[in-house]
Amino acid sequence: MESDSNIAIEEVKYPNILLEPVYYNNLEVIGSHLHKPDKNNLCNVCDVLNKITEEDVISAGAKQQRPMRLRSKPKPDICKGVSDSVKQKNTIINIDEITSTHDWQYNLRKDADAIVRYLMDRKCDINNFTIQDLIRVMRELNIIRNERQELFELLSHVKGSLSSNSVSVKTSHPLMVIYSHSDNKIGEQLKLLENTYDPSRYQALIDTTRFQSTNFVDMSTSSDMLFRFKDQDSIGYVHPILVALFGVKLPALENAMVLGDSYSLMKQLYNSKKVKPENYMLLINRLTEDSPIIFTGINDSVSSEIHRASIHTMLRKTILNLRLGIFYSKDCDLVDNHLMKIIHINSSQMMADEEQMLASILSIVGFRPALVSITDPYQPLNVVLKPVSYIVVSPSKMITTINNPISINSNSIYSLSFDNTTGRVMFMPANMRYQGTISCRTVDALPVLNSISHDRIINSPVIVNGTLIYYIERRQNKNIVSGECFTGFRSVINDRPMDIANELNINGITYLLKSAVCYKTHDLLSTMSGSCDGGDVFLKGYYTILFTEMGPWMYDPLSIYSKQSRESRLMRVMKNQYYKEHGNDDGMFYDWLKEESTKKLCDIKQQQLMHHTVMFEDDLLSHEEAMNLISRNCCILVYAQDYLPYLATKSITEIFV
């Protein structure tokens, strides 16, 4: 009998999974030149800065503030070795050190650092470190703190500094490069930016959008205004995804995008190293990013932050306009192209246009509102928490029937899996297994039997901060050709109906369906009015449905560019007026059209449409009509809490963080 001693057991090596966050963007600290407005320069950053200064951002608002003077900085030590700079890149800084803004917190932290050094020098065990131990160390270090709040703040600082679980960030992060004054050119660059942003009345734009936000609920708030879709020199329109995200006041996203500001965040980090409360959530989002984004043609970190701040400014102006009913874009306002050029390095495949747009908008402020627990594909007993911007639903990879459609509701919200090939969190109902590739050995998020799947709610793997977003992949040929906005290619859209719930209940909190972006495959207005002309399955564009206080409202910017759409829209306007006067019974609609008073109303509405203007009430839909369109054509679903109840459950610091 042969011996088995020579038999070698081959060890199976799996590829590294993408669940562990590794932040490194492979960029230089600062570029070869300083950026300033210059339309003749081939630099993308300079070109965008030039667009910001071409005309005033806003014509009224707060008065200009004096630029903050920079601190005098000691000369760098020329004897510093290369090893010191490498060591600095690997250093981590506790986020609490940056978000604390008051002097008493700064002094308190200095005392806490002294206590930490004392404990580390003596190799003390802090597992059972109490207030009594803290007071004893303070007495030895001659630190006098008697108030209860101060003592517990000190204890928190000490334990946070010595704990490996505290939230920290590497100094190689672009914001930390600015915070630590890593290069003399950074200060020179920020001085040039002050000359760029001040003439454009930048502070007025910030103050106005923040004031507008306090009084805004959804687009019905602006129902007394005339909505404009075209101007003489306008060349585009506000993208429907922007209307879906900012046409309704969404919790957490509003705090980061409207209350927060990327440019002032950079200034505060560099000048005073203290961040104001308005920028708390933006700062936390940015410093806890899993991976950076890269802008095409930009090769250094500081320039990337400047470009990000410029895009944030353009988005802010777009938000201001769309909430005033201004839906057209001029050349200096076109932000879509800049968003389409962002490279998301954590994605292993080219995104479809709508996913690219959604991911880019959210990545500008690092918005990831959902924290989901995902099982490690190679270690089933290892469950990790992963923050995500949105959850992906892929109908083409699921087997469905008329009696068993894809259902997004409170019972299926916890059915999630991680796709290692794309680095995305996938919606995976228990009765519709997600068919991944061989390299993506997906397993159930919480492996339980289908008969007891209701137990998922008890140990919820989904924690949501105000807003939850779904992205539905309906393109049937997404991996063949992409980039409709550049190539003119039209994808085939899968219009298989889905069961979409009006509300989700997550951890006892109700999240309502606030908005939906849908694929436009035909002239939907004429189709809804009874005509079957123009129906097909090819993508022509997008439209948005908002659920406002006055009912579902449709934003369809492409409807003004077709005669058939304009005629159908006029009919829709007249029907809404008829329903307003006579209820939902349309039996006498055509007799009503022949009345003299109706003809005058029709002429007024026709004149408005000829000038590409409408009233808010002209585009209202019935709830049944809206849900039918969403069921067949939705590509983005936005669920959120009502904003005021969201604030009521938060403390003053949690509102910003």
From Swiss-Prot:
Write down the Pfam families for this protein, in alphabetical order.
Answer: Pox_P4B
Q: What is its main location?
A: virion
Q: Answer whether the UniProt record assigns the keyword Coiled coil to this protein.
A: no
The entry's keywords = Virion
Q: Where in the cell is it found?
A: Virion
Per the record, its GO cellular-component terms are: virion component
This chain belongs to the protein called Major core protein 4b
Task: Write out the propeptide range(s).
Answer: 1-61
Query: What is the protein's known function?
Result: Major component of the virion core that undergoes proteolytic processing during the immature virion (IV) to mature virion (MV) transition. Essential for the formation of a structurally normal core.
Chloroplast keyword on record: no
Give the free-text PTM comment from the record: The precursor is cleaved to a mature protein during virion maturation. Proteolytic cleavage of major core proteins P4a (A10L), P4b (A3L), and VP8 (L4R), which occurs at a late stage of core formation, is required for production of infectious mature virions (MV).
Q: Which family does it belong to?
A: Belongs to the poxviridae protein P4b family.
